[in-house]
From Swiss-Prot:
One of its GO terms (cellular component) is nucleus. Catalyzes the synthesis of dihydrouridine, a modified base found in the D-loop of most tRNAs. Specifically modifies U47 in cytoplasmic tRNAs. Catalyzes the synthesis of dihydrouridine in some mRNAs, thereby affecting their translation. InterPro entries: Aldolase_TIM, DUS-like_FMN-bd, tRNA_hU_synthase_CS, Znf_CCCH. This is tRNA-dihydrouridine(47) synthase [NAD(P)(+)].
Amino acid sequence: MDPSQPQVKRPASSDEQPSAKKTDTATSKGIAHLKPEFILFNDQNGSSRPMAGEYNDEEESTSSRLESQPANQIKGKKQNSKKKRGQNKNRDNRQVREQHALCSKFVTNVDATCSFDTKCRYVHDVREYLSKKAPEIKTEFFPICPVWQSLGHCPMGYKCCFLSSHCNMETLELKDLYEVDERKKLYEANHEINHIDGERKYDLIKRRFSFTKSDYILEIIDAMQQENRDLMNTSKGSETTTDANAGEDANDEKVSFQATEKQNQLTEKRERQRELYLKYHDTRFFAQEKRKLDLHHKKIVSPLTTVGNLPYRRLMRKLGADVTYSEMALAVPLIQGTNSEWALPKAHCSEFPGFGVQIACSKTWQAAKAAEALAANVTGVSEINLNSGCPIDLLYRQGSGSALLDNPARMIRCLNGMNYVSNDIPVTVKIRTGTREGHPIALSITKRLVLETDVAAITLHGRTRQQRYTKSADWDYVGEVANAVRTYEAERQENKNLRDGQKIQFVGNGDCNNWEDWYKHLENKNMDSVMVARGALIKPWIFEEVDAQQYMDKSSKERLEILKDYCKFAMDHWGTDQYGISQCRRFFCEFMSFFHRYVPMGICERYPVLLNERPPNWKGRDDLETLLGSTDSNDWLKLSEMFFGKVNDEFVFTPKHKSNSFATN
């Protein structure tokens, strides 16, 4: 037993009294303290079974779009000895579509016609399609189509996996549950927003979209940069210019027409830059009137790639969250009109107001154009957030995410460009304490953010990029930065050119997984709120505890109801056809990769369980609780069958962590 750890006293009968080795397991550093009757032991000397594997929380910020980068090469012996550890870097969870797919024209109309006629590669005969369609889904939780039940009609029509609940199978007549007016009311209360118009997206794809504001602000920023370069190199520039002019005089007749034209263009450009510099150098040229952003004591869910999808955010709204964010969208694919990227700003109507879109970029032009495209094409956005904290290697090497911490001048240019083009949508930023362990730089960066930008909010994650999740977040430093921000704001107020700025919201982030942490961090009056990430994945009811200011020992049935809500929201979003159900099941398993980590309060000797504490293998108070806590991805699939029916042969799911991949014999 570690002598630095206090021994936990607990009542136990003589026959239940654990041996010394059991006590070691329960009180070891980094291990959750469980009641001995819930710890699973597999030998006579009292040692517990080893844990299934360590959690790697890089999943919080990694998605299939970003994880296909080559893994580090590991030498043979080491690789073989750790074959069940680490991440499945090249996993591909894309789902297979139907082989005999129904033509979209016939999805809700058996008598429709298709302009491609016999040349169409899809099925036109509805009865033929139904004869080859996979068996219908019928579960205890969803005996009828949940979408049809909530909206009054099912957009999936004959493709729906619950078809018999809203179709006369003899006449193939589709049934509506409510009249048109009633269905409109239901739609108003349950629909998705931020759909980009098809023509506008096509303009982006064909590069016909006019980035008028971006072009202008980028020209101003370039002029400022050029002037600064000239000022720094005045003497050197003068000598160079003199030498160049001498050369030109000596070789006047040899200068080509093309070179002259190029020189004229450069001269015109430099004159234009000089004009812009003189016009704007003493102004906050990027300032725009914005909607007020209020994050004070709001319950905020962090942007979460892959798992932070629309159904999850909708679930968190139902469970008490005030502010949610999209998954991180990459700026360049947004500018190019990529479908997968434009799916990310979509939100449920319950999320707005209080919904932010997060983008990642490496260049100023990317930030400005992505922000302008968003502001012009989506209306349900409360803020646009610049991700300057993502630790993923692929993005870091490209200059995105936390790489901007190493280049604060570029970060500031990105934010100012975004602020100018985003109309009345506030711009915010999320940063880390730094990139290298032991070298925090957030204090110096936040000073520049306060004085040189108009950001409406700053979120600080209390770790460096290098630390990732190996150490606890440094909340002392986060509090120090929060205090400094108010000092910098006071300094800004003294400057007549800067004092028009609104109060900057400051949000702390990192390791908050219970209501006591929440209120402890907010004892610092300079902290506006706390952003919750993994804590809200493992325990989605965390904001209910914040409101009640007490811990809630959710039963297995209550937790299963939470999963039911998630599945219902997933089918509303991805659909109830075969492909949609596969997508729902896949993201259900992604959600379970965090949700299973909850250790029930009733089996713990010490509570709360910290995020970096891992339990020994345990059994729950009932079989369902044990199943919900399983680390085996096969058990997650069993849980999914309660909601989505039997897993078909075409379904594909590879867990993020290899330690979750084992099969139970």
